[in-house]
Each structure stands twice: as C-alpha cells, then as structure tokens.
UniProtKB/Swiss-Prot annotation:
Example of a GO biological process term: tricarboxylic acid cycle
Quaternary state and interactors: Component of complex II composed of eight subunits in plants: four classical SDH subunits SDH1, SDH2, SDH3 and SDH4 (a flavoprotein (FP), an iron-sulfur protein (IP), and a cytochrome b composed of a large and a small subunit.), as well as four subunits unknown in mitochondria from bacteria and heterotrophic eukaryotes.
Name under which the protein is recorded: Succinate dehydrogenase subunit 7A, mitochondrial
Pathway info: Carbohydrate metabolism; tricarboxylic acid cycle
Organelle transit peptide residues: 1-30
InterPro entries, sorted: SDH7
Intracellular or extracellular location(s): Mitochondrion inner membrane
UniProt entry keywords in alphabetical sequence: Membrane, Mitochondrion, Mitochondrion inner membrane, Transit peptide, Tricarboxylic acid cycle
Organism: Arabidopsis thaliana
Gene field: SDH7A
Membrane topology field: Peripheral membrane protein
Source domain of life: Eukaryota
A cellular component term, taken from the record's GO annotations: mitochondrion
Length: 93
C-alpha cells in the first residue's frame, strides 16, 4: 500500500513539474518596465522634506534607549513579583 502511495505521489509530482517547465521559462517577477516621469518625480529627493528626514544614528540611539528601558521595566516587574511571593511565604511561615 505504501509503495502504491509513494509511486502515485512521485508520478503526480513528475507530471506537475513537466507542466510548470514552460511557466518557469518566464520570469516570475514579470518584465522590467522603465519608470515614467511621474514615478521619477515622486522618487526624487524633495528639498522641503529634508528637515523631516530621520537621521540613522539618532534613530538607532533612540531604539537602543527604548530597548534598555524595556529590559529595565521587565526586570523591575519580575523583581516585584519575586518580592511579593517571598513576602507571602515569609508571612505564611
């Protein structure tokens, strides 16, 4: 039974791969089309928006500070839970 299952699966895969060989000849991404004037204008750098551009070093530093604060808050919460459990155990004993 397992032999029949394996042969039927392999024959199915072989037949489906033969069907898709022609489709693989065409690129999956399609053809490259040059950008039009409107797209080029939208992608061009705009001088009026330059002051709103985020600076990579500043953003990286801010992310790092946020990560550190998150770790500190989580550690503080864990310590509070630990302290309350120990306090309850001390009262119960």
């Amino acid at each position: 039974m397992a032999f029949l299952l394996n042969t039927s699966i392999s024959s199915h895969l072989r037949s489906s791969s033969q069907k898709t060989d022609g489709a693989l000849a065409q690129s999956r991404r399609g053809f490259h089309v040059e950008l039009g004037a409107r797209e080029k204008a939208l992608l061009a750098e705009d001088a009026s928006l330059r002051r709103f551009k985020s600076h990579k070093k500043g953003v990286h530093r801010l992310k790092r500070i946020g990560d550190v604060l998150t770790v500190v808050v989580v550690a503080g919460c864990c310590y509070e839970i630990y302290a309350r459990v120990m306090r309850k155990e001390a009262q119960a004993a």
